[in-house]
């Protein structure tokens, strides 16, 4: 499985997930109005959302763009 690690306009990067990590995730963390921090990567299980987080998990290559 290949997941997006960072998704900048010029240099999107991806990573091959290690054995046992069969999900890609993208986390939006609310900072202030119109400002969010994005975290992307591989996971064995879908991370739990914390305060003001939205998490999307998926199981296909680069599905967490």
From Swiss-Prot:
GO terms for molecular function: toxin activity. Keywords: Disulfide bond, G-protein coupled acetylcholine receptor impairing toxin, G-protein coupled receptor impairing toxin, Neurotoxin, Postsynaptic neurotoxin, Secreted, Toxin. Disulfide bonds join 3-24, 17-42, 46-57, 58-63. Expressed by the venom gland. The keyword Secreted applies. It is found in: Secreted. Belongs to the three-finger toxin family. Short-chain subfamily. Aminergic toxin sub-subfamily. Monomer. Binds irreversibly and specifically to M1 (CHRM1) muscarinic acetylcholine receptors, blocking further binding of antagonists and preventing the action of agonists. This is Muscarinic m1-toxin2. It comes from Dendroaspis angusticeps. The lineage of its organism: Eukaryota, Metazoa, Chordata, Craniata, Vertebrata.
